[in-house]
Regions:
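Active-site-adjacent betaalpha module
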Residues: 1-41, 55-62, 91-96, 107-108, ...
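Short acidic, Gly/Ser-rich segments with clustered Asp/Glu that frequently serve as metal-coordination loops
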Residues: 47-55
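A solvent-exposed, charged loop/short amphipathic helix patch at secondary-structure junctions
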Residues: 55-75
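A short, N-terminal amphipathic alpha-helix
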Residues: 80-99
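A basic- and aromatic-enriched beta-loop-alpha substructure that forms the phosphate/nucleotide-
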Residues: 101, 105
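Short, glycine-rich nucleotide/cofactor-binding loops
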Residues: 73-81, 176-183
C-alpha cells in the first residue's frame, strides 16, 4: 500500500498524528481507517476531451510551444497508467456508492469572459464551452447517471464552482482525486479541498503531468499534508472491504 511522505517521514509529534489529513482518527500506516464510501466523492479533474485527447488542442498547444516530449509523456502516462487504473477505480467507486464528480475547465460565457485571464486563450482556442464536445468527459470515464458535474473557470475544482455546496449537501467529507495535470489543476484542487476541511486521498496512478520529475514533485508536495498518496488498487480494496462488510 502506498504511504504519504508526511506520514512515513515522521513529521508529526505523536499527539498531533490523530488530526493529520483532516482525518479525526488518522494513524500512520492505516490510511483507510474509518473510510466510508457513502461519504466519499471521486473528483475527476479535467478528464475531458480537449485536455487529454491525443489530437486535442491542449496537447497541440504543448507541442506548438516546443515541448513535444512533454506532450508525449502525458499521453504515454495516460495510455499506460492512468487509463488502465481508471478502468479499475471507476466501476469500483460506482458500485460502492462513491459519488463521481466531473470537474471540467470550460466556459459558460459567450466571449469566455468567465475564464481566468491566464487560461482564457487556451479555453477559447479549444472551443471549450459548457455543452461542447470539447468540454465533455472522455469516453474512458463516461458520464453515468448519478455523476455530478461542475464547470470550473480556473485551475481548482472548488474555485468559482458549487462543488463544496454539493458535497456538503450529501454529507460527503472525504475526497479521492484523479485527473490532470498533477502539478496544476489537481494540486490546486487538493489544496483548496484541504482548507475546506475534507479528508483527502490522491490516487497517484490515476493522475499525470508532463514529466516524471513533475509527477514525483507533485506527489511529494501533496503527500506532505494535503492528501494521503494511494494507488487505485489501494482504493479499490478499501471500497470492496467496506461493501462486503455491509
Amino acid at each position: 500500500m502506498a504511504t504519504s511522505p508526511g506520514a512515513a517521514g515522521g513529521m508529526l509529534p505523536p499527539d498531533l498524528s490523530a488530526h493529520w489529513y483532516n482525518a479525526d482518527d488518522f494513524a500512520p500506516g492505516e490510511s483507510w481507517r474509518a473510510f466510508d464510501p457513502a461519504r466519499t466523492a471521486l473528483v475527476l479533474v479535467d478528464l475531458i476531451n480537449w485536455q487529454v485527447d491525443p489530437a486535442g488542442p491542449s496537447i497541440a498547444a504543448i507541442r506548438a510551444a516546443g515541448h513535444p516530449e512533454r506532450a508525449d509523456h502525458l499521453l504515454a502516462r495516460f495510455a499506460d497508467t492512468i487509463g488502465p487504473n481508471l478502468e479499475l477505480l471507476l466501476p469500483a467507486a460506482r458500485r460502492a456508492g462513491v459519488r463521481v464528480v466531473h470537474a471540467r475547465l470550460a466556459s459558460r460565457h459567450p466571449d469566455y469572459g468567465d475564464i481566468v485571464p491566464a487560461l482564457r486563450p487556451y479555453v477559447q482556442a479549444a472551443g471549450a464551452y459548457d455543452g461542447s464536445l470539447a468540454a465533455m468527459p472522455i469516453a474512458e470515464v463516461g458520464d453515468e447517471p448519478g455523476d455530478l458535474s461542475v464547470v470550473k473557470s480556473g485551475s481548482g475544482a472548488f474555485g468559482g464552482t458549487e462543488l463544496d455546496f454539493l458535497l456538503r449537501r450529501e454529507g460527503i467529507d472525504t475526497i479521492l482525486y484523479a485527473g490532470v495535470v498533477t502539478t496544476a489543476c489537481v494540486l490546486l484542487s487538493v489544496a483548496a479541498g484541504f482548507d475546506l476541511g475534507y479528508r483527502q486521498y490522491l490516487v497517484a496512478d490515476c493522475t499525470g503531468t508532463l514529466s516524471a520529475r513533475d509527477q514525483e514533485d507533485a506527489e511529494r508536495l501533496i503527500g506532505n499534508y494535503l492528501a494521503e498518496i494511494v494507488t487505485a488498487a489501494d482504493a479499490v480494496a478499501a471500497m470492496e472491504q467496506q461493501t462486503h462488510a455491509l
